[in-house]
C-alpha cells in the first residue's frame, strides 16, 4: 500500500537528494532576494499535513462537497486572523498566489479593456501591474506611471495629472522593487478625484504593515491584495482584503468559481499559522529589525561612490543599487555573487537603459537574513562582502576569501539546524 512507502528519503532517494541539496544551499548561502524568507517549522508542518487530501470547493459553511467540517474550521481561523492582523472587515485566503489575488481583484473591479493606471515595471512595479507580456497587460488597457527622474521617488502631483489625462477606472499602487514608503492616502485622493477604484498590492510590505512599521493601505484602498510569504513569512500564497461588503462578494466569486476550483486547505492552514505568528508582539520587533538591517546595509553602499543607491535610501525591506561602475551589468553581478554564496537578483532601475535580461542594478532585501537572527552589524558586513566581491570580480583569491567569510556568517546563524 502507498501508506507503507515511508518517508521521502527512503522512497525516492533521487528526489530527496535534490531537496537535501536545497536545504544545504539555504543553510550556507546568504539569502538577499527581497521576495524570499524563511518560514517556521510550524508553517511547514501545517502545509505538509493531511489537509492536502481534502477537496473543499466553495467557502466555509457553503461547500460543494461533504466532509468539510474540519477544513471549515481551518479556513475560518485563517480568515479571522487575517482580518484581525490587518484591520480589515473581509478577507479571502483562497488565492493560490499574489498574481491570482491580483487577477481576482481586477475581475471584481473592472471589465476587460478598461483603462488602469499602474506602476511601470522598470520603476519598481510588478508584472501583474500591466506588463504587456502578462495577463494584466493583455486583458486591460494599462497606462504606466513612473517615478520622478531626479528623486527616483513617486511624484503624487504628476500621478494626479496623469490620472486626469487618462481617466482610469482603476489605479494600482504597490511595487516589487520600490524602496520608499508609499502614501496610500494620497493615492486614494487621486483615485477619488478621477472617480477610480484604488487597489493596493502590498505583497512585499505585508509583514511590515501587519507589524505597524509601515503605513497600512487597508483604510484607503477599495481592495488590498498580498502574498503571504515575503515579509509576512508564511507559505507561498495569496490574500485579498476589503472593507466593502459588496466588493467582498465579488472577490469571493472571482476567486471561486471565477479563477480557481478547490482551495489548497493545507496551504490555508499554513497561512493561519503565519497569521498567528504575525499577531504575536514579537513580530513587530522582527519587522522593525528588517527595516533597521536594510537601512544599515543600504548606507554602506551609499557611502561608496563606486555604487549608486537608487532614490538615495530605503524606508522598507528592500533597496536597489546601480552596479555598472564596477561590473558590466546586474546579471553578471548576480552570477558572480552566486559563486560566493550570496543570493540576490538583477533588477531594472528607473529609466533603465539595458535589457531586462541584463539590467543596470541589483535588488537587495533583508527579510530572510533577519529571520536568521542577523542584525545591523551583520548587515553591514554583508554589504562590504558584496562590494568586495564585485570590485574584485576577476580576483579568485579574493572571491575565495569572501566565500569563507560568508560561511563563517551562516555557521554563526544556523537556519533549521540546531
Curated annotation (Swiss-Prot):
One of its GO terms (molecular function) is glycine hydroxymethyltransferase activity. Its EC number is 2.1.2.1. Pfam families: SHMT. Its cofactor is pyridoxal 5'-phosphate. The keyword Nuclease does not apply. The record marks 229 as: Plays an important role in substrate specificity. Keywords: Amino-acid biosynthesis, Cytoplasm, One-carbon metabolism, Pyridoxal phosphate, Transferase. GO terms for biological process: glycine biosynthetic process from serine; tetrahydrofolate interconversion. It catalyses: (6R)-5,10-methylene-5,6,7,8-tetrahydrofolate + glycine + H2O = (6S)-5,6,7,8-tetrahydrofolate + L-serine. (6S)-5,6,7,8-tetrahydrofolate binds at residues 121, 125-127, 355-357. Its main location: cytoplasm. InterPro entries: PyrdxlP-dep_Trfase (IPR015424), PyrdxlP-dep_Trfase_major (IPR015421), PyrdxlP-dep_Trfase_small (IPR015422), Ser_HO-MeTrfase (IPR001085), Ser_HO-MeTrfase-like (IPR049943), Ser_HO-MeTrfase_PLP_BS (IPR019798), SHMT-like_dom (IPR039429). The keyword Cytoplasm applies. Pathway: One-carbon metabolism; tetrahydrofolate interconversion; Amino-acid biosynthesis; glycine biosynthesis; glycine from L-serine: step 1/1. HAMAP family: SHMT. Catalyzes the reversible interconversion of serine and glycine with tetrahydrofolate (THF) serving as the one-carbon carrier. This reaction serves as the major source of one-carbon groups required for the biosynthesis of purines, thymidylate, methionine, and other important biomolecules. Also exhibits THF-independent aldolase activity toward beta-hydroxyamino acids, producing glycine and aldehydes, via a retro-aldol mechanism. Belongs to the SHMT family. Homodimer. This is Serine hydroxymethyltransferase. It comes from Streptococcus pyogenes serotype M49 (strain NZ131). The gene is glyA.
